[in-house]
Amino acid sequence: MLDVTTFDELRIGLATADDIRRWSHGEVKKPETINYRTLKPEKDGLFGEQIFGPSRDWECSCGKYKRVRFKGIVCERCGVEVTKSAVRRERMGHIELAAPVTHIWYFKGVPSRLGYLLDMAPKDLEKVIYFAAYMVISVDEDARHEDMPGLENELRLEIKTLQDQRDSQIAERLGRLETDLAALEAEGAKSDQKRRAKDGAEKEMGQTRKAFDEDISRLERVWEEFRSLKVGELKPEDAVFHELQDRFGIYFEAHMGAEAIQKRLEAFDLEAEGELLREQIATGKGQKKIRAIKRLRVVSSFLATGNSPAAMVLQVVPVIPPELRPMVQLDGGRFATSDLNDLYRRVINRNNRLRRLLDLGAPEIIVNNEKRMLQEAVDALFDNGRRGRPVTGTGNRALKSLSDMLKGKQGRFRQNLLGKRVDYSGRSVIIVGPQLKLHQCGLPKQMALELFKPFVIKRLIDLSHAQNIKAAKRMVERSRGQVWDVLEEIIRERPVLLNRAPTLHRLGIQAFEPQLVEGKAIQLHPLVCAAFNADFDGDQMAVHLPLSVEAQAEARILMLASNNILKPSDGRPVTLPTQDMIIGLHHLTTLKEGVAGEGRAFSSVAEAILAKDQLSLDLNAKVRIRLHDIYFGEGEAPEGVELDEKGKTVGPVLLETTLGRALFNETLPVDYPYIEAVADKGKLSEIVNDLAERYPKVEVAAALDRIKDAGFYWATRSGVTVALSDVLTPPTKAAILSGYEKQAAKVQGQFEKGLTTNAERRQELIEIWNKATAEVAKAMEDNLPADNNINRMVSSGARGNWMQVRQIAGMRGLVSNPKGEIIPRPIVHSYREGLTVAEYFISTHGARKGLADTALRTADSGYLTRRLVDVSQDVIIREDDCGTGRGLDLPIATKGADGSSVRDSNVENSVYARSLAADAVNEAGEVVAPAGSDVGDVMIDHLIAAGVHEIKVRSVLTCESAVGVCAACYGRSLATGKLVDIGEAVGIIAAQSIGEPGTQLTMRTFHTGGVASADDITQGLPRVQELFEARTPKGASPIAEAAGRITIEDTDRSRKVILTPDNGDEPHIYPVLKRATLLVEDGQHVELGQQLHVGAIDPKEVLRVKGVREVQKHLVGGVQGVYRSQGVPIHDKHIEVIVRQMLRKVTVVEHGDTDLLPGELVDRARYNEVNRATLTEGKKTASARQEVMGITKASLATESWLSAASFQETTRVLTQAAMEGKSDPLMGLKENVIIGKLIPAGTGLAKYRDVTVTATEEAKAERYPNRIFTDESVFNESDLSFVDFDSFSSDDYTPGTYN
């Protein structure tokens, strides 16, 4: 089979009939599958062994040849080649069609490629293909022109003859009438007899005249049609056409069905058509020009690739290998088969019937009907349901065609190529393992034994505990003692991967060193739970085994939990102590007044512990302890304490602290500044962040483990419990509420008197009750004692927040109704007091809405992540520095009123972890930091202190790398805290960072109901999607297209904002809804791009009016706004990566002398390259306008057809790609995963993969100490250390011969 490592590009094209025959191993002639008695495949059938290979390895069908020694022999009795049965997965067959059929993708796809090429409407095409009309294929213009006068004379003569015949017949009838009338007169007949005779004669003459006139007019129509006949014309199947064919059939050719299309395509002159269309584009306007451009795209594709358009009509249908459309026997003798077999059988049956009809010379009408049925059968095989009603199987279920096999989540791309399952894996429930180190996990013994079974067996044989594999297997199954010893030895320092679904970001899979544990549950380190989003309420996790040495090395170096302390989304630690640990450390470091031992002094921590053990000292009492070698931060040392230059105390120091704090500081690194504070959640976060910034990962991991152990130890001893008596309702609650009740009654009274509107009443009531709730909450907080256990949990940050406590102990407050409006009547009781029935009922709305929202959010967020990954998957760091001087100017501080610098609140997620693009200069013009400096926490503090307010930083938005981005523009990798490595897949990390917190974003806002409603403003997840899809928002606000003055025109029905530009251009008129809140006033002067009323702005407008940089700012700011409002930190650079991909394409406006087509979407890099080449030749370059594309559209517009096809609209992408003969450069990750190559990221990058290792002189000398090396030495090439040179004697060797 094809080796994926041997090629770097993958091209798709249109297969010709010869190609299909070349792939095939034989023609499938019969619709039979297998013989139901012998269960062997039928000869020449859909499973025939003669075509597709033997069903059993090394065995022909009749059994004459068995065993591998007959390999390659074709049995003369049954015609089957003796080979492996695996060839039934690769060998194809074919069906020779009795009549050509069109490929449904090219005729029925949108747009119809066949329609564009032949300049026909899809409706007309359908008429021809399905035998409802004839198409003129060719006209012999010269012969027609030459014979026209003679033919016309003949026809005129014929018409004259017909006219003469008509006249003579009518005259004859008239004569007869006169004779009859004379006879009647003579007989003395009555007048009504005469009238009858007269009427009868007139009727007869009328019929004669009509018959002759019809013939004459038909001949005239036939002549007119013949004169004006042209290629491509459609003719209905009627008497006129048959007459035309009979009389003038030698001058033209007309056909029906795919045959007509095929003949047109074979005679189609692509070059001439291309020239004609270019001319039309140059001179045409409007719709005509647009259609010409679209047609030229199709024509150019065929011209460029050399594909024959006739390949869109099939004469041969390929039959895929039988193992890919299997047939399996069920219990009870029935068979289950792939739908494809049924579809193939329909094609074969109809094809055979058509062939028989043609051989019998059946009438054309019957043959045409059979051809149409064959066309429909092939259509159903390729894309069932695309045209007309789908072919159904049992239970009215539409059969799955070849297209359905590729499409959607269950299709080949997403199910089997991008979603493979792996062996060497297992899964189990997780439980907490507080005794583990950060890089360890507890693996159940039985599970480990099963996972490492092959390795255990090999080691047992190596150690001679077993003689062969079978014996070793038996030992393992019986769990002998030696097996456990061997298992312990094997798993030592051998990492395993743990994964928890859903894997929303890269921290969802991490490596750990397994520790064997009893039981059946996997033990997980408590600090990594946040990264996995795991808890221990029944969650399950999967274990995977990295097998190769390279995989183990990557797992250990890149994926080990102790190396993944930082979150890739914002570069801050993810392994923070939580819950019990925080309670324990909070208990340890709290300071209490008036407890045992307060004010005592101790010579060491050990002595203080002794006093505590004797119960004479409280853990939290303020005492003085003598400590040695303590470090203090700048300005933090107590008075009188002397420090050296590193901040370390000189000699011992008697420090006023608590025993708990002294113990807590022992968990931190020796040279870490002494912490004299309560370790609550915020403080711990600060400490861990600082540790991660200052120390190597090994030390950070060790410190985190010590902090964790101390947290659990002291949480146990803190005795924190919760009883109902801890829930204290404030005694002042009733008084507070009665005051607000009076205010509410007053507002209600004003409304009832008609002094206020309903909206104003609601608004005022909501404000009153919000104040009441806040006051009750304040009273409740003040009422809770400091040592109250609920208070301790919330104030330490271990669990819960004040809002939850308020609902339990204070009052629930305002809730919303099912419409999302706030009900202006609060729930005045708390859960502790119990709710009334009415209160309970109105609470249920919010609860139910919350659950429904969460379910919707999860699906939406997952789909957003998928689109983000798809659009950014080929953004990989490809080079060190692209050399650009461009960058973004970002603020880091503002000048306060007192002249001091105030740090910008968004610094953490905007400038942090980037590189300077230009020197950072303060107001005095001094360079504070040179260009290229890394901007970390320390640097930011240094810049602000030096009075720098704005810096220019490198950004992926301004990176000029042709493929991917460069390391300098990206800056630090947030996951490691160092400059990003070449090969890092920053696009996927960006997508994960944005998508992972997606579930936390609300679906939509709550409406307060009434005037101040945020009704039309989309927020939360839908807003993020709207921005990334670059959609025009609902109720979008216009922006000023020029600087100028505003005039507002208000009428009863409408409102207009008129902008008169300063430069005297035409005024711009913006119609505005009456209910919109304007941001400008009559007569106000506005600047370019200023927003005119409240609402979101359309990104496409921002791009058109203000340019690329502004639309970048708008998109990044908009997305950040949503995430910040939910308190989710994400670094700007991730959003910038996605925005870079959205602005990747330009639309060609004028093509100049280039090959580009007007209206074509082109990659900016390719556009610049084409223009550069055109310029060097001295020709006219193309012009283009920048596009902002939504992420879905951008994913489908990628250069890689494999990636686009596996994303969405599979059939459309493949149709287009095959027609254009597209070549996939395999630069992204998806396309390489699909074909099974190493991904071009990380260690899979060619830069790292194609490394050749050459030994240094020292290494050689060390390995071969007795040999002298010269450059010609054979050892430079290979290692011949196994050769015993001394055993050669000179007699054995003569030059040029071997004995």
Swiss-Prot record:
Pfam families: RNA_pol_Rpb1_1, RNA_pol_Rpb1_2, RNA_pol_Rpb1_3, RNA_pol_Rpb1_4, RNA_pol_Rpb1_5. Disulfide bonds: none annotated. One of its GO terms (molecular function) is DNA-directed RNA polymerase activity. One of its GO terms (cellular component) is DNA-directed RNA polymerase complex. InterPro entries: DNA-dir_RpoC_beta_prime, DNA-dir_RpoC_beta_prime_bact, RNA_pol_asu, RNA_pol_N, RNA_pol_Rpb1_1, RNA_pol_Rpb1_3, RNA_pol_Rpb1_3_sf, RNA_pol_Rpb1_4. Its EC number is 2.7.7.6. Keywords: DNA-directed RNA polymerase, Magnesium, Metal-binding, Nucleotidyltransferase, Transcription, Transferase, Zinc. Mg(2+) binds at residues 535, 537, 539. DNA-dependent RNA polymerase catalyzes the transcription of DNA into RNA using the four ribonucleoside triphosphates as substrates. This is DNA-directed RNA polymerase subunit beta'.
